[in-house]
Design a protein with these regions (language model features):
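Active-site metal-binding core of divalent-cation-utilizing nuclease and nuclease-like domains
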Residues: 40-69
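Aromatic-acidic/polar surface patches that form glycan- and anion
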Residues: 25-26, 62-64, 225-232
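Short hydrophobic/aromatic-rich motifs at helix boundaries and adjacent loops
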Residues: 4-7, 65, 208, 212
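A general structural-boundary detector
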Residues: 19-20, 53, 60, 82, ...
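Short N-terminal signal/transit or membrane-insertion segments
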Residues: 1-6, 49-53, 175, 224, ...
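Charged, often flexible domain-edge or linker segments that flank or initiate folded functional domains
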Residues: 69-80, 84, 93, 97-287
Length: 288
């Protein structure tokens, strides 16, 4: 049975030829759903909801074009048209606010697309209000290899087949341009805002800034850089642990021992992952 990447290699030229000749948003939507989502990525039409009505507490109404699990698709005739994108972003903010009020624990992604260009967005949330949008790793399938197209869609559509672990697949899934990082960075910002005045957290941030001053010649006060370092430090610890444990253990109760370094000592590795500047999200006030 051919892999998804092999199917993409076979079907992509024909898909691009036809999608470029569709002259309406509806035609592009129908063709993309049946050919790209259905034929290549096995997304069944019955798993999609169309024209989903939305309404916020402030009575802003909308109608989401297509909903698949936690993904909101906003279809456009031309995703290179700046006005169309601006209009789409306004609509996505309404949809995000609706779903935040309806399902506050569920994380939604919005994608503005014309079937060729896919622009994914995540909401920036402050005090239970969607204040702005953050765009992540935009995809143009006419300029991207079948392998990278597969990795990109796997981030959102969740293919069941196993992905070979390579530096490229890790970067696509967890890199600083990935939706995973953008979502976690937003969560880290909200957490940091809640505990920034705690003595231990403040000390970690100040010590981190001091050490970077030695490297760069001036103190680093950029919180986004601190969040990046926190994310990357945590990710490395988790990946190394998965490798050492042969990926046999994924229990959430092991997260604390991994991040504080205790689990690595059990493998005979010391001074690799002791408590550092980036364990601040493990503050008891956050965990409780």
């Amino acid at each position: 049975m051919p892999s998804t990447v092999e199917i993409l290699k076979q079907e992509l030229p024909n898909y691009l030829h036809h999608i470029k000749n569709k002259n309406s948003e509806e035609a592009k939507k129908q063709y993309c759903i049946s050919s790209l989502f259905g034929k290549i990525f096995d997304v069944a039409s019955e798993d999609l909801d169309f024209e989903v009505p939305t309404k916020t507490v402030s009575k802003l109404r909308g109608r989401a074009d297509t909903l698949f699990q936690n993904i909101i698709f906003e279809w456009k005739q031309d995703a290179k048209n700046s006005k169309a994108i601006d209009d789409g972003e306004i609509e996505l903010k309404k949809y995000f606010q609706h779903f935040l009020e309806k399902e506050p624990l569920k994380k939604y992604v919005g994608i503005i697309t014309d079937g060729i260009i896919f622009k994914p967005y995540l909401p920036i949330i402050e005090k239970n209000k969607v204040t702005s949008l953050s765009i992540t790793n935009e995809l143009n399938i006419s300029k991207t290899s079948p392998e990278d197209i597969f990795y990109w869609f796997d981030n959102y559509l969740g293919k069941s087949e196993k992905i070979k672990l390579t530096s490229k697949s890790i970067k696509m899934q967890f890199g600083l341009d990935s939706p995973n990082f953008v979502a976690i960075r937003n969560e880290l910002k909200n957490l940091f805002d809640a505990v920034r005045d705690y003595k231990d957290v403040k000390l970690k941030f100040e010590n981190w800034s001091h050490y970077l001053e030695i490297v760069y010649g001036e103190k680093q006060k950029e919180e986004n850089l601190f969040f990046k370092h926190t994310y990357l430090s945590t990710l490395v610890k988790l990946i190394v642990h998965l490798k050492l444990s042969s990926m046999e253990s994924n229990r959430t109760d092991e997260i604390l021992p991994i991040l504080f370094g205790n689990r690595f000592a059990q493998f005979g590795i010391v001074n690799f992952s002791e408590e550092d500047f980036f364990t601040w999200p493990m503050q008891i006030t956050i965990r409780t």
